Amino acid sequence: MAVQKNRKTRSKRGMRRSHDALTTAALSVDATSGETHLRHNVTAEGYYRGQKVINK
């Protein structure tokens, strides 16, 4: 079992956790429908960069 020999300080703990922060999703508004969607992804209506790419 891995058990540490010495206690880690609050500073070292914080440095380790510095990369754990979450970022917000990059959202865009579609020009044709005005729908909010993830960047570089097709909208629910099937539009990508203003063009219809998927027919439902």
From Swiss-Prot:
InterPro entries: Ribosomal_bL32, Ribosomal_bL32_bact, Ribosomal_zn-bd. Keywords: Ribonucleoprotein, Ribosomal protein. GO terms for biological process: translation. It comes from the Bacteria. Residues 1-28 are annotated as: Disordered. Coiled coil: none annotated. The keyword Zinc-finger does not apply. Residues 1-16 have a biased composition (Basic residues). One of its GO terms (cellular component) is large ribosomal subunit. GO terms for molecular function: structural constituent of ribosome. Belongs to the bacterial ribosomal protein bL32 family. This is Large ribosomal subunit protein bL32.
